[in-house]
Design a protein with these regions (language model features):
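N-terminal flexible segment immediately upstream of the FAD-binding catalytic core
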Residues: 1-81, 91-123, 152, 270, ...
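Terminal amphipathic helices with adjacent charged low-complexity linkers/tails
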Residues: 277-279, 311-408, 446, 597-612, ...
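Flexible inter-domain linker/hinge segments
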Residues: 3-13, 75, 209-253, 521-593, ...
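Iron-sulfur cluster-binding electron-transfer modules in prokaryotic oxidoreductases
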Residues: 522, 529, 654-986
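Ferredoxin-type iron-sulfur electron-transfer modules and their immediate structural context
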Residues: 403, 408-410, 483-488, 495-636, ...
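C-terminal substrate-binding/cap subdomain adjacent to the FAD-binding core in PCMH-type
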Residues: 54, 164, 172-175, 182-393, ...
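A glycine-rich phosphate-binding loop feature that marks nucleotide/adenosyl-phosphate handling sites
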Residues: 94-97, 153-160, 241-248, 252, ...
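N-terminal glycine-rich flavin-associated loop
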Residues: 54-86, 104, 108-151, 163, ...
Length: 986
């Protein structure tokens, strides 16, 4: 290795491209049509694509977001005219650095995601490269078919990316890698040649040569290359289930049908651009069982793999106790982990069949046979939702290896080597001995059934000594893998992490063959240059282009929040995002609503995190809190906090947005509506000054259309929206008027009169007070005006927000110190005291106690009044929508359980965010996105509900979205549980 290692982001000579402005002009001239945002060369757009899920960072020349194949062809021609390198990109979740480069990035994921056809009889589907895997699988499952490879990123990885990477996943054991499931490809070469490739018979080969031209030259060159190197390919290519390293030259061997499409799979965009793909589908067993075996350690679990494979499972995965310990520290899959059998390492063995009886027989026979497997401790069988929950433990693995509290950062860099399954135990023992030499450690998880185990290690990339140790380690680890007949990459590809190690695995002759193959397809070396294979052998080394390298220092700006879990550094917090892209899923969960609506990288949690990191580093983007590009990206963040729970590394973009806006508005004045919405508690309190009268006066302008329209216009409120009207009397006013006496010997709870339920929906608080009384509690209701300050965060009023919380800590000190439960009905208000309170006061004992004592009604009943008898709703269907903060900061299980105790059938919608999100949905510029999100699941479900169905949601914003878009009224959980009561409350 060189004496002086390349330093972070040091550009190479061939990266220099001086015609970016001219290229942008040519692309804009060429790519016309209804979408006007196909060409993006601004700094913000480029910053979004500087990295993927790897350790690497390179600044692209620009970004193209094509509508269709014609756009791709035209854009490549424009790039070719100026010699600009290009890089095709799908979901951007690659782990080896193959989807970041100093090139023009083509993002296929926004528009080119069509499923052109699916023929269940022929078991084939034709798709565009940007389609997400889960969409293909969902369509195929209607016919009991599937696309076999299913990486853990299946909810957001694209088929184009899978083809480029040769992706695998759990069920590659059942149906093979991506390369084994490609029928044909339509591809575009850098020189403009467009062709369809697949298996090639002798007659087809002769016909191609007869036609002549570039395609004939290409095929003739490939045939000659194979004729020269066939014997060496047969000798050196490992015969294992998981060889992903190198080019798939073995697919061009005569015995494999000279399959050109499959030879291109795994080429990481270095040879051609995929325009469409025809996929082979396989039978998907409709009935499945999961058998989980416990072992004393991961090594003996690996030893058991050959014996288990004799039973022909369709999936065989492994996890170890270190991974589970990390999950415990991060509070991941807590209930699911308790379902595992005894042991310190576990194998997840899945079987499939056509009927339940058949698969049960297979699973129970295997469990009986497993008693004879050495060191197997216990075996549990799971089906249905229980099996799905166990699989979620496995799919949480990557998130459990990064940013683990109390542990050093773990990085990719040696995370997916594969060996013959029979030698997996030997490999792991030898590898861990090598790791101990270097002081490295890692959890283990992955595809044990195919000899591929994933890990992330505590590499030191921030010093040259650390880099030298890293390079020495991977050199020796590669030697170990090769000695066992394995592959340096068994799933994630070579990219930049492993490209320099390929000569160890393939030898000089095959490396020359790879370079010849590269020159045949890309003689000008313009396709993802420097990654995997270079025609001139100028590949990037694993120690170049590191996002965090020697001399790196996390930015340390002064902030309002403490960022305590990130050592007090906002800069380190923004490094949390490791690019796995869970925020880019579109069909389930709540994260990330703005991405679901726009499919724009800048509107994903990942995109925003990367922009904030770039801004704080001050390299590509100015280190300036006034950065309009960053503000624009944050503008569509609904502050739903879904990322806090659904992001594998717990990015809290709502808090990051509030922090940014606090600094931004130190230099830019607030808008008038910021004061209206942000300080809504004060306006509501003022409107209630004279009970009954002042509320009517405050509502009056909203009832006169010309005045209401003028107010909306001035404040930038969407004309389609109706501003909520104040209730005639607040809950506090009603409570004080009753002047009720409560027994002194009863346990007490403090019922928080939040702004929304107090001033707008007092009936919810009334119902809650009645529930508490019936449950045997004396109710404390603050007499003074109180507010958690939730709306202040939406506009960056963080100094004021801190003061609100400090006031609560002071004024309610006796109740906090006595351990009194603080009961909230509005999830977004409760989340302030669970979340932001500790972000401001992380070491304040009283703040910690208040956070622990803050409960939603359902939680309170579960903890303190489990014998409460709710109102009964037999033969009724309840449609439940969870507020985003309820799901992110608390959970829905308690509420579900209590609603079921009413005798009703309860359906919890997987609707994500309702789209209203406090003031967001009222703002004119956000109305369209708000409606798109509402219409995704929630509003259609409300309209489809029967008149007798009860609609339940605890969020004021959610109820407003329903009320303003349907004729239905949603109820608060408290209203549903509260039995009919007399009008007065004791």
């Amino acid at each position: 290795m060189a004496e002086s290692l390349p330093i972070l982001n040091q550009p190479r000579r061939h990266e220099r491209f001086d015609a970016a402005r001219e290229l942008e002009t040519r692309l804009r001239t060429t790519l016309r049509g209804p979408n006007h945002d196909k060409v993006r060369f601004d700094a913000t757009s480029r910053a979004l694509y500087t990295t993927d899920s790897s350790n690497y960072r390179q600044i692209p020349i620009g970004v193209v977001v094509p509508d269709d194949a014609d756009d791709v062809i035209a854009a490549v021609a424009a790039c070719r005219s100026l010699g600009a390198p290009i890089l095709a990109r799908g979901g951007g979740t690659s782990l080896a650095g193959q989807t970041c480069n100093a090139a023009v990035v083509f993002d296929f994921s926004k528009h080119m995601r069509r499923l052109h056809s699916l023929d269940p009889d022929a078991r084939v589907a034709t798709v565009e490269p940007g389609i997400v895997l889960d969409r293909v699988r969902e369509a195929a499952e209607l016919h009991n078919l599937t696309f076999a490879p299913d990486p853990a990123t299946h909810s957001r990885c694209t088929l184009g990316g899978m083809i480029g990477n040769n992706s695998c996943g759990t069920h590659a054991l059942m149906g093979g890698k991506t390369v084994d499931n490609i029928r044909s490809l339509e591809v575009l070469l850098y020189d403009g040649t467009r062709l369809s490739v697949g298996a090639t018979s002798d007659d087809e080969f002769r016909a191609i040569l007869h036609r002549g031209g570039r395609v004939a030259q290409l095929y003739q060159g490939m045939r000659q290359l194979i004729d020269r190197h066939a014997d060496e390919i047969r000798r050196r290519f490992p015969r294992i289930p998981r060889r992903v390293s190198g080019y798939n030259l073995d697919e061009l061997l005569p015995e494999n049908g000279f399959h050109v499409a499959r030879a291109l799979v795994g080429s990481e965009g270095t040879l051609a651009t995929v325009l469409s793909a025809t996929l082979d589908l396989v039978h998907s067993p409709p009935c499945r069982r999961l058998v989980v075996l416990g072992f004393p350690d991961a090594f003996v679990a690996a030893d058991a793999v050959p014996a288990i494979l004799e039973h022909h499972p369709i999936g065989l995965e492994g996890i170890d106790s270190t991974l589970l310990e990390n999950m415990h520290r991060k509070h991941l899959a807590e209930a699911e982990r308790k379902m595992l059998p005894a042991g310190n390492a576990f194998l997840l063995v899945e079987f499939g069949a056509s009927t339940d009886a058949e698969v049960d027989a297979i699973a129970y026979a295997f469990r009986a046979a497993a008693r004879s497997i050495p060191h197997a401790l216990e075996a549990n069988i799971f089906a249905g939702e229980d099996a799905a929950r166990i699989w979620r433990v496995r799919e949480s693995a990557l998130g459990a290896t990064v940013f683990v509290p109390g542990k050093p950062h773990l990085w990719e860099g040696w995370e997916d080597a594969a060996v013959p399954p029979a030698r997996l135990g030997e490999y792991l023992r030898s590898l861990f001995a090598l790791m101990r030499e270097y002081g490295y450690h890692s959890p283990l998880y992955g595809h044990y059934g195919q000899g591929c185990v994933h890990m992330r290690m505590n590499f030191d990339f921030e010093s040259e000594a650390g880099l030298r140790a890293y390079r020495s380690f991977i050199d020796r680890a590669a030697d170990l893998v090769v000695s066992l007949g394995g592959s340096i990459s068994g799933e994630h590809g070579d990219g930049q992490s492993r490209a320099a190690l390929l000569p160890k695995m393939f030898g000089a002759e095959l490396m020359q063959a790879f370079r010849e193959f590269k020159r045949l397809w890309d003689p000008d070396n313009r396709m993802n240059p420097g990654k995997l294979i270079s025609a001139e052998d100028e590949i990037y080394q694993p120690t170049e282009n590191l996002r965090v390298g020697p001399g790196y220092h996390a930015a340390q700006p002064e902030t309002h929040f403490s960022f305590d879990r990130d050592h007090g550094s906002f800069g380190e917090a923004t490094l949390r995002c490791v690019g796995v892209g869970a925020c880019r899923k579109t069909d389930s969960g709540s994260m990330c609503p703005s991405y679901m609506a726009t499919r724009e990288e800048q509107h994903s949690t990942r995109g925003r995190a990367h922009l904030l990191w770039e801004m704080l580093q001050g390299n590509l983007l100015d280190r300036d809190w006034s950065n309009e590009g960053v503000k624009h990206a944050l503008d569509l963040c609904l502050s739903c906090k879904a990322c806090k729970s659904e992001c594998p590394v717990s990015v809290d973009m709502a808090s990051w947005k509030a922090e940014f806006l606090a600094h931004y508005h130190q230099q830019h004045p607030h808008e008038l509506r910021h004061y209206l919405f942000g300080f809504m508690d004060r306006w509501a309190h003022l409107a209630a000054a004279v009970p009954g009268l002042s509320q009517r006066l405050a509502n009056l302008p909203l009832q006169i259309p010309p005045i209401s329209a003028t107010i909306k216009s001035i404040l930038g409120i969407a004309p389609q929206r109706n501003l909520p009207r104040f209730a005639p009397r607040t809950f506090q006013q009603q409570w004080r008027a009753q002047n009720a006496t409560q027994a002194a010997n009863l346990p007490q709870a403090l019922l928080w009169p939040d702004t929304w339920n107090n001033y707008y929906h007092p009936q919810s608080l009334t119902a809650a007070s009645q529930i508490l009384h019936t449950a045997g509690y004396a109710v404390q209701v603050p007499r003074q005006h109180v507010c958690c300050g939730r709306p202040l965060y939406d506009f960056g009023f963080l100094d004021t927000a801190r003061n609100y919380l400090r006031r609560i800590l002071t004024e309610f000190a006796p109740q906090i110190d006595s351990g009194l439960p603080f009961l909230f009905l509005e999830p977004s208000c409760a989340s302030v005291l669970r979340n932001e309170l500790l972000d401001f006061f992380p070491r304040d004992d009283r703040a910690r106690r208040l956070a622990d004592q803050t409960l939603l009604l359902s939680q309170f009943l579960t903890r303190h009044a489990p014998h409460y008898e709710p109102a009964q709703h037999p033969d009724t269907r309840i449609v439940l929508h969870g507020h985003c903060h309820h799901k992110a900061v608390f959970n829905m299980e308690d509420e579900l359980a209590w609603l079921r105790r009413t005798g009703a059938t309860v359906e919890l919608l997987d609707a994500g965010c309702c789209g209203m999100a406090g003031p967001f949905g009222f703002e004119r510029e956000h109305y369209s996105v708000s409606q798109t999100l509402g219409e995704r699941v929630l509003l259609p479900a409300v309209r489809a509900a029967a008149p007798a169905d009860i609609l339940v949601t605890d969020g004021f914003s959610c109820r407003e979205q329903i009320a303003q878009n349907t004729p239905r009224r949603a109820m608060h959980f408290a209203e549903v549980l509260c039995p009919p009561q007399p009008t007065s409350t004791p």
